[in-house]
Amino acid sequence: PSHPNVYEPGKRPFHTIIPAFIMQNELPLMSFGLMGGSMQPQGHVQILINMFDYGMNPQEAGDAARMNHIGGRRPTGGGDDDLLGVLHVEPGVSQETVKQLEDMGHRVEVVADGIMFGGYQAIYRDQETGVYIGATEMRKDGLAIGY
Protein backbone atom coordinates (compact mmCIF):
# COMPACT_ATOMS: atom_id res chain seq x y z
CA PRO A 1 0.00 0.00 0.00
CA SER A 2 2.91 2.45 0.38
CA HIS A 3 3.94 2.09 -3.26
CA PRO A 4 3.53 5.38 -5.19
CA ASN A 5 1.52 3.59 -7.89
CA VAL A 6 -1.04 1.92 -5.60
CA TYR A 7 -4.70 2.33 -6.62
CA GLU A 8 -6.53 4.83 -4.43
CA PRO A 9 -9.67 6.95 -4.84
CA GLY A 10 -8.95 10.18 -6.71
CA LYS A 11 -5.47 9.05 -7.73
CA ARG A 12 -4.29 8.38 -11.26
CA PRO A 13 -1.84 5.50 -11.63
CA PHE A 14 1.41 6.07 -13.49
CA HIS A 15 0.74 4.90 -17.01
CA THR A 16 1.86 5.99 -20.42
CA ILE A 17 0.06 5.65 -23.69
CA ILE A 18 2.29 4.58 -26.55
CA PRO A 19 1.15 6.63 -29.57
CA ALA A 20 2.24 10.20 -30.13
CA PHE A 21 1.30 12.59 -32.91
CA ILE A 22 3.16 15.75 -33.86
CA MET A 23 1.77 18.69 -35.80
CA GLN A 24 3.88 21.45 -37.35
CA ASN A 25 2.41 24.63 -38.81
CA GLU A 26 -1.05 23.08 -38.35
CA LEU A 27 -0.10 20.12 -40.59
CA PRO A 28 0.54 16.50 -39.58
CA LEU A 29 4.27 15.83 -39.23
CA MET A 30 4.74 12.47 -37.54
CA SER A 31 2.92 9.68 -35.76
CA PHE A 32 5.19 7.53 -33.64
CA GLY A 33 5.43 5.38 -30.59
CA LEU A 34 7.97 3.66 -28.42
CA MET A 35 6.68 0.75 -26.37
CA GLY A 36 8.36 -0.34 -23.18
CA GLY A 37 6.69 0.65 -19.90
CA SER A 38 8.55 3.47 -18.17
CA MET A 39 10.82 3.69 -21.23
CA GLN A 40 7.91 5.08 -23.28
CA PRO A 41 8.03 8.73 -22.17
CA GLN A 42 11.83 8.66 -21.90
CA GLY A 43 12.11 7.20 -25.40
CA HIS A 44 9.61 9.63 -26.90
CA VAL A 45 11.63 12.57 -25.61
CA GLN A 46 14.92 11.07 -26.80
CA ILE A 47 13.50 10.54 -30.32
CA LEU A 48 12.28 14.15 -30.46
CA ILE A 49 15.57 15.56 -29.15
CA ASN A 50 17.48 13.53 -31.74
CA MET A 51 15.29 14.83 -34.55
CA PHE A 52 14.66 18.45 -33.61
CA ASP A 53 17.82 19.33 -31.68
CA TYR A 54 20.34 17.14 -33.51
CA GLY A 55 18.79 17.12 -37.00
CA MET A 56 18.49 13.34 -37.34
CA ASN A 57 15.95 11.77 -39.67
CA PRO A 58 13.33 9.44 -38.10
CA GLN A 59 15.41 6.29 -38.64
CA GLU A 60 18.64 7.84 -37.32
CA ALA A 61 16.74 9.15 -34.30
CA GLY A 62 15.50 5.64 -33.52
CA ASP A 63 18.89 4.00 -34.10
CA ALA A 64 20.78 6.41 -31.81
CA ALA A 65 21.96 5.14 -28.43
CA ARG A 66 19.34 5.49 -25.68
CA MET A 67 19.25 5.93 -21.94
CA ASN A 68 16.69 4.41 -19.56
CA HIS A 69 16.31 5.50 -15.93
CA ILE A 70 14.85 2.84 -13.65
CA GLY A 71 14.09 2.95 -9.94
CA GLY A 72 14.45 5.77 -7.53
CA ARG A 73 11.63 7.22 -5.51
CA ARG A 74 9.44 8.47 -8.36
CA PRO A 75 7.29 7.48 -10.09
CA THR A 76 7.51 3.73 -9.50
CA GLY A 77 9.30 2.97 -6.29
CA GLY A 78 12.49 1.92 -4.62
CA GLY A 79 13.33 2.30 -0.96
CA ASP A 80 15.83 4.51 0.83
CA ASP A 81 18.64 2.33 -0.52
CA ASP A 82 17.57 3.28 -4.04
CA LEU A 83 16.98 7.03 -3.88
CA LEU A 84 18.45 7.76 -7.31
CA GLY A 85 17.78 4.57 -9.21
CA VAL A 86 20.01 3.51 -12.08
CA LEU A 87 20.59 5.15 -15.44
CA HIS A 88 21.08 2.40 -18.00
CA VAL A 89 22.83 3.46 -21.20
CA GLU A 90 23.62 1.68 -24.44
CA PRO A 91 27.24 1.14 -25.51
CA GLY A 92 26.89 3.94 -28.09
CA VAL A 93 26.83 6.54 -25.29
CA SER A 94 30.38 7.88 -25.07
CA GLN A 95 32.60 7.08 -22.09
CA GLU A 96 33.03 10.83 -21.65
CA THR A 97 29.26 11.22 -21.22
CA VAL A 98 29.09 8.25 -18.82
CA LYS A 99 31.91 9.71 -16.71
CA GLN A 100 30.27 13.15 -16.67
CA LEU A 101 26.98 11.61 -15.50
CA GLU A 102 28.79 9.65 -12.78
CA ASP A 103 30.63 12.80 -11.68
CA MET A 104 27.21 14.44 -11.30
CA GLY A 105 26.19 11.65 -8.90
CA HIS A 106 24.28 9.32 -11.22
CA ARG A 107 24.64 5.57 -10.94
CA VAL A 108 25.28 4.54 -14.57
CA GLU A 109 25.32 1.02 -16.02
CA VAL A 110 26.18 0.27 -19.65
CA VAL A 111 23.80 -2.41 -20.96
CA ALA A 112 24.51 -4.19 -24.24
CA ASP A 113 21.10 -5.90 -24.56
CA GLY A 114 18.91 -3.33 -26.28
CA ILE A 115 15.58 -4.88 -25.28
CA MET A 116 15.19 -2.60 -22.25
CA PHE A 117 15.38 0.49 -24.46
CA GLY A 118 11.95 0.09 -26.01
CA GLY A 119 10.59 -0.60 -29.46
CA TYR A 120 10.06 2.34 -31.84
CA GLN A 121 8.03 2.86 -35.01
CA ALA A 122 7.29 6.09 -36.87
CA ILE A 123 5.60 7.53 -39.94
CA TYR A 124 6.94 10.96 -40.87
CA ARG A 125 5.52 13.30 -43.52
CA ASP A 126 7.97 15.61 -45.30
CA GLN A 127 6.25 19.01 -45.20
CA GLU A 128 7.79 20.20 -48.49
CA THR A 129 7.27 17.13 -50.68
CA GLY A 130 4.38 15.36 -48.95
CA VAL A 131 6.42 12.13 -49.06
CA TYR A 132 5.94 9.73 -46.15
CA ILE A 133 9.00 8.23 -44.48
CA GLY A 134 8.84 5.13 -42.28
CA ALA A 135 11.19 4.24 -39.45
CA THR A 136 11.43 1.05 -37.44
CA GLU A 137 13.27 -0.26 -34.43
CA MET A 138 16.62 -1.92 -35.02
CA ARG A 139 16.62 -3.48 -31.53
CA LYS A 140 13.59 -5.69 -32.20
CA ASP A 141 11.75 -7.28 -35.08
CA GLY A 142 10.08 -4.67 -37.22
CA LEU A 143 9.72 -3.39 -40.75
CA ALA A 144 8.90 -0.04 -42.33
CA ILE A 145 7.35 -0.59 -45.75
CA GLY A 146 5.22 1.43 -48.14
CA TYR A 147 4.23 1.75 -51.76
Report residues per predicted region.
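Proteins synthesized as precursors that undergo proteolytic processing into mature forms
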Residues: 1-114
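In a subset of proteins, long, contiguous C-terminal domains/tails are tracked
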Residues: 95-147
